[in-house]
């Protein structure tokens, strides 16, 4: 259940700080924030150009692999990232995240859910939905193919397309999602883009709460095709905590995204 694009850019020496912030927002071991399974994008901070679109069952762990913090896995972009940093100070990084209801089973949460499954006398597979993992494969295929159709080639660091199922589901406006990954200055005209960076949300639980609230409206926009204002009105009807009013009073809806 995708909905929110969260943008940031980091220096080479800030990679571990970024990884910790991603893990804070998208941990597989808790049920708040967002699911650990999602789409990510590396982009040229200076040219505002997509370099790579990928998927991960565990976004924080995959980021660490790409940046050489964890042992290299197949498909790691560590060499490309090192080459980029040899010529540039900052690298753009964006995550396209899902609701925690889409959290799949990954190695970091397996022990927790094995314990729950044993207590419930149920197969561990029954404890979590695999829909989240299936969705990221499909969405990755859609986004890479939409880029290829628009520009005539894959992103620079992508050597192939994604899911064949995803490739057959591309719609003309899907390229707008791809462009949102690397164009932070256009945040105000794109309602799926967070007004705070990955690290800002990690440092500010209230802002994270606001973006989690808006995620529900974004899901309705992307999944049901509702207009954003209509989706927002719909979720506000059930806002028993007064989250949206608090958001308005705090000035968060006027906050500028600075990456």
Give the positions of each predicted feature.
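Boundary/linker segments flanking structured domains
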Residues: 1-37, 45-49, 60-259
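Active-site ExK catalytic segment of metal-dependent nucleases
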Residues: 53-57
């Amino acid at each position: 259940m995708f909905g929110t694009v969260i943008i940031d850019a980091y220096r080479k020496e800030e990679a571990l700080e970024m990884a910790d912030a991603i893990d804070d927002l998208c941990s597989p071991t808790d049920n708040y924030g967002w699911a650990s399974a999602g789409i990510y994008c590396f982009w040229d901070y200076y040219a505002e150009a997509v370099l790579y679109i990928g998927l991960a069952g565990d976004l924080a762990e995959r980021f660490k692999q790409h940046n050489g913090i964890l042992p290299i896995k197949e498909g790691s972009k560590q060499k490309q990232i090192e080459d980029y940093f040899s010529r540039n100070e900052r690298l753009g990084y964006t995550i396209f995240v899902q609701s925690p209801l889409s959290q799949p089973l990954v190695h970091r949460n397996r022990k927790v859910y094995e314990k729950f499954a044993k207590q419930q006398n149920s197969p561990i597979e029954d404890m979590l939905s695999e829909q989240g993992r299936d969705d990221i494969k499909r969405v990755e295929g859609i986004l890479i193919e939409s880029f290829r159709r628009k520009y005539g080639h894959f992103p620079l660091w992508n050597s192939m397309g994604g899911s064949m199922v995803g490739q057959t589901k591309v719609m003309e406006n899907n390229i707008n999602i791809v462009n949102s990954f690397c164009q932070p200055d256009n945040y105000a005209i794109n309602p799926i883009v967070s007004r705070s960076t990955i690290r800002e949300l990690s440092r500010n639980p209230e802002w994270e709460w606001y973006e989690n609230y808006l995620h529900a409206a974004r899901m309705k926009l992307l999944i049901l095709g509702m207009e954003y204002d209509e989706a927002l009105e719909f979720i506000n009807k059930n806002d028993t905590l007064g989250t949206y009013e608090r958001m308005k009073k705090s000035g968060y809806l006027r906050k500028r995204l600075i990456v």
